[in-house]
Amino acid sequence: MKLRWFAFLIVLLAGCSSKHDYTNPPWNAKVPVQRAMQWMPISQKAGAAWGVDPQLITAIIAIESGGNPNAVSKSNAIGLMQLKASTSGRDVYRRMGWSGEPTTSELKNPERNISMGAAYLNILETGPLAGIEDPKVLQYALVVSYANGAGVLLRTFSSDRKKAISKINDLDADEFLDHVARNHPAPQAPRYIYKLEQALDAM
């Protein structure tokens, strides 16, 4: 009986460790960042327009598309910053006071895609993530929300947005990453933060 319990414990611990091992397989950011850097003039312009760090934009481009403006995912995320017309694209259109959603050709246009990606980051920062005080924690929250939705992230802290933001403000960046690794339902959420740091280090 003790042997069975010990075997069960080993399996349980192995499962827990694999859940948090978001750095495997290792990701080499060098080439994706080099390709993303070619769009830096556009990223700087969009960043200035929307109050977003151009290096954050460049890192997201490296992670999302590897700098390929024609990239299309299985879920129909399009372009350099992998925007979905029916979700983030529609949100940006609404912020601009426009109806409808962007076309595929519009999302494959580097300038339009980066501009809308920066606008969407601004929507996240000034909307559901407003009130996060630590700049690095905010950066982490932005990329996790960009990839998997702000609502999903906030609900790992509380169903009440204000309470969630308050709990986030009790954490430093490492503690926030640990919380995401332990509590976020999407395994790619902590890995996105890992890739973000790899990309920023490669610039």
Curated annotation (Swiss-Prot):
Membrane topology, record value:
Lipid-anchor
Query: Lipid attachment of type N-palmitoyl cysteine occurs at which residues?
Result: 16
Q: Which CDD domains match?
A: LT_MltC_MltE (cd16893)
**Biological process GO annotation list?**
cell wall macromolecule catabolic process; cell wall organization; peptidoglycan metabolic process
Q: Which UniProt keywords apply?
A: Cell outer membrane, Cell wall biogenesis/degradation, Lipoprotein, Lyase, Membrane, Palmitate, Signal
Instruction: Tell whether Lipoprotein is among the UniProt keywords.
Output: yes
Signal peptide residue numbers: 1-15
Q: Where is the lipid attached (S-diacylglycerol cysteine)?
A: 16
Cited Gene3D superfamilies: 1.10.530.10
Q: Which InterPro entries does the record match to this protein?
A: EmtA, Lysozyme-like_dom_sf, Transglyc_AS, Transglycosylase_SLT_dom_1
Q: Which PROSITE patterns match?
A: PROKAR_LIPOPROTEIN, TRANSGLYCOSYLASE
Compartments, as annotated in UniProt: Cell outer membrane
Q: Where are the transmembrane segments?
A: none
Q: Name one GO molecular function term.
A: lytic endotransglycosylase activity
Q: Which GO terms describe its cellular component?
A: cell outer membrane
| Its job | Murein-degrading enzyme. May play a role in recycling of muropeptides during cell elongation and/or cell division. Preferentially cleaves at a distance of more than two disaccharide units from the ends of the glycan chain.
Q: Which family does it belong to?
A: Belongs to the transglycosylase Slt family.
Question: Record's HAMAP family?
Answer: EmtA (MF_01381)
Query: Could you identify this protein by its name?
Result: Endo-type membrane-bound lytic murein transglycosylase A
Name the source organism. Shigella dysenteriae serotype 1 (strain Sd197)
Q: What is the lineage of its organism?
A: Bacteria, Pseudomonadati, Pseudomonadota, Gammaproteobacteria, Enterobacterales
